[in-house]
Amino acid sequence: MKSALSFLIAARRSEIAGLQRLALTSELVGAIGRLVHALQRERGLSNLYLGSQGQRWAAERLAQVAQSQALQADVERAFDQLDTDAALSGHRTRLFGRIAYALQGLSALPRLRERVGQRQWGTERTVAAYARLIQALLAVVFEAADSAWDPDISRHLVAFLNFLQGKEFAGQERATGSALFAAGRMDTDSQQRLLHFIESQERCLQVCTDLASPAIRQLWVEAQRPEHLMPLERMRRILCTTPPGGVLDAGHSQAWFDACSRHIDAMKQLEDALAAELQGLCSQRLEATALELAALERMAGGLGAGRPTGTG
């Protein structure tokens, strides 16, 4: 019968394998994060372009598309580096399924851009299409990161993933407000969606700050200083208090987009800090677990050497 020690050794080996997977996927997570950030900006510029009836923002949108395409190539290279021939665990099966779905979304992106460029779609449909693609990419991150048993790492993972989701709600807020200002008129459905995006991002960010380290919380406090958020809050009040059918100043489009972008860019810096902290925790835990495993294996070797052998 196998001893308790043999199962402890197996548990440590399994934990190390999970931590190694998490460490190896950090490059993939970083590449996806950069692409998502670019697509969020592309979505906002697309809505400015559509809301202005194609009269403005065309050049800015195309420049952002080019940047997104370069970052998409980085993500696809990261996907290509994954070993799809190795024996599949349940985790890798789910991860590869998420990647397949994300690649389908990326393959449809040129057609989405074409429809936006030709103004075949409205702003609401465009926001939804980009949101589906971004959610597919974030699902890859969620699955890639879901491989840790250590409670500290798990807590940081929950904080990190909630932050990513909160940032996506901030991106949808930017896109929806961009369309409203560019169109110059408030409508009920868009206003309700805007309120939903604001409330949802605040909820996700609260979960993140509740679980994050003191260093991350301090970074977030700095990003939330009144002088940083005042322009955004002022523009939010305009959008949230203008009655349905009321006129919006299209000249505020640039100010809104810039205020949201400063906020989201600051969030990207915090996202990078969260990812770096998570990677550091993973490395520390990997080193400690490797030492524990080595000690257990020495113990097992000593026990084996001490057993009497048969004389026949």
Where are these regions (language model features)?
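Hydrophobic alpha-helical segments
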Residues: 1-312
